[in-house]
UniProtKB/Swiss-Prot annotation:
It catalyses: alpha-D-glucosamine 1-phosphate = D-glucosamine 6-phosphate. Belongs to the phosphohexose mutase family. Pfam families: PGM_PMM_I, PGM_PMM_II, PGM_PMM_III, PGM_PMM_IV. Its EC number is 5.4.2.10. The modification Phosphoserine is found at residue 93. InterPro entries: A-D-PHexomutase_a/b/a-I, A-D-PHexomutase_a/b/a-I/II/III, A-D-PHexomutase_a/b/a-II, A-D-PHexomutase_a/b/a-III, A-D-PHexomutase_C, A-D-PHexomutase_C_sf, A-D-PHexomutase_CS, Alpha-D-phosphohexomutase_SF. It comes from Thermosipho africanus (strain TCF52B). Its cofactor is Mg(2+). This is Phosphoglucosamine mutase. The lineage of its organism: Bacteria, Thermotogati, Thermotogota, Thermotogae, Thermotogales. Keywords: Isomerase, Magnesium, Metal-binding, Phosphoprotein. The active site is at 93 (phosphoserine intermediate). GO terms for molecular function: magnesium ion binding; phosphoglucosamine mutase activity; phosphomannomutase activity. Binds 1 Mg(2+) ion per subunit.
Length: 430
């Protein structure tokens, strides 16, 4: 059976994602590694249950568990790299609180398809170790400190004094750590959505709901928004306008090029990134490579082509000379560093990077394959002068429709027509 999606194992808790599934995953990983497995989680109420099941699975296989508590996914990735070990992050990232997920990390990196398939096969056949070899559970109190120290050393010359930031931590895994780190660098921080109760993670907040903190953006403040597990980051500029992942990539690509960090003068983006970003980068002698949607595909291309910077419009951005995965805090610090070095406001920098109007619709369906119908294909063929992408979500029962072009009204009409067509054929299948 296929358990892994585009970003680990993810689903509604106690429907698809059960304690038994978590136990089987833990047992499979525990049998594959020597020694220890690090575990961290976000703030969802189901995290404790899934953590307990994972621990039982891992220790029954004879491996030790190092429990890191609540911390962002990129922090766990760093720990596994420093410790040359495996890790499992309990999080569904930007998804609603009824979802959770299990992301397996090996020595800093997410798994390739071949290793996921091997784990899935192992999950079918639970293997217990003898009683004298049952693993232990260690509360790893140094995890947060290790990550903090790593960030402090990376950006030891960064001074954010005088910068006023409203920080939306999405009631998620960054609620405690990330504001402290930005304050360390001198920024004045106002934190919102930082009272996690297990049920409010990502709920009308965080990087998927930037409009909800616009009222806080006054008197020269800028906004920083994370998702539930802290691997994404977007900004609001001083005018309350979204400074999304495409803008961040454009701004920081120029900064990395000046610093001699942009290997091969190339950047990796996905098919969802705006044509305006590509033209801006090309005008600055930077080539653009496009991949399928998903940070794993971005990372694969970066490693294959020896590229330092890659990411998604959603704010999932990888600085490979800084981290092995998308890191919302590093993305924030790279963006703030570029802003400080430019001597300009974020709003002024935003105007330099063009952004063609985009319309994105999420069409709920019972069958995600419906988008492949002949009628939808013919409709897409008939559209001229607009970029259209129709694709199924890897984590939710929806088909995503993206239309991009010179006129917002026309893009909206096209997107709605396609969405209606998908709904029509989905209803016929029910």
């Amino acid at each position: 059976m296929r358990y892994f999606g585009t970003d680990g194992i993810r689903g509604v808790v106690n429907e698809f994602l059960t304690p038994e599934l978590a136990f089987r995953l833990g047992n499979a990983v525990g049998n594959m590694v020597n020694g220890k497995v690090f575990i961290a989680k976000d703030t969802r109420n189901s995290g404790d249950m899934l953590e307990a099941a994972l621990i039982a699975g891992i220790t029954s296989a004879g491996a030790d568990v190092y429990r890191c508590g609540i911390m962002p996914t990129p922090a766990l990735a760093l720990i596994t790299k420093l410790e040359d070990a495996a890790g499992i992050m309990i999080s569904a990232s930007h998804n609603p609180p009824e979802y959770n997920g299990l992301k397996v990390i090996m020595k800093g990196y997410k798994l390739p398809d071949s290793l996921e398939e091997r784990i899935e096969n192992e999950m079918q056949n639970v293997k217990y170790n003898s009683f004298e070899k049952v693993g232990r559970v260690i509360d790893y109190r140094l995890a947060e400190e290790e990550y903090f120290n790593y960030i402090k050393e990376l950006y030891k010359n960064l001074d954010l004094s005088g910068i006023k930031i409203v920080m939306d931590v999405a009631n998620g895994a960054t609620f405690n750590l990330n504001p402290k780190i930005l304050e360390y660098f001198g920024a004045k921080i106002e934190v919102v959505n930082n009272e996690p109760d297990g049920f409010n993670i990502n709920k009308d907040c965080g990087s998927t709901h930037p409009e909800n903190i616009k009222n806080y953006i006054v008197n020269g403040k800028i906004g920083i928004l994370h998702d539930g597990d802290g691997d994404r980051c977007i900004f609001l500029d001083e005018n309350g306008q979204e400074f999304h992942g495409d803008k961040i990539i454009g701004l920081t690509a120029l900064q990395l090029k000046k610093e001699g960090r942009l290997k091969n003068d190339k950047v990796v983006v996905t098919i969802l990134s705006n044509m305006g970003l590509e033209r801006f980068l090309n005008e600055n002698s930077i080539d653009v490579v496009r991949t399928k949607v998903g940070d794993r595909y971005v990372l694969e291309e970066m490693l294959k082509e020896n590229i330092t910077l890659g990411g998604e419009r959603s704010g999932h951005i990888i600085y490979l000379d800084r981290s092995t995965t998308g890191d919302g805090l590093i993305t924030a610090l790279e963006t703030l560093s570029a802003m400080v070095n430019s001597g300009k406001r974020l709003a002024d920098l935003s105007n330099l990077i063009p952004d063609y109007p985009q319309v994105m619709l999420n069409v709920k369906v019972s069958d995600k394959e419906v988008y492949k119908s002949k009628e939808v294909f013919e409709k897409l063929k008939s559209i001229k002068d607009y970029r259209v992408i129709v694709r199924p979500s890897g984590t939710e029962p929806v088909v995503r429709v993206l239309v991009e072009g010179p006129d917002m009204d026309e893009s909206t009409i096209i997107a709605n027509d396609i969405a209606d067509l998908i709904k029509k054929f989905d209803n016929k299948k029910e």
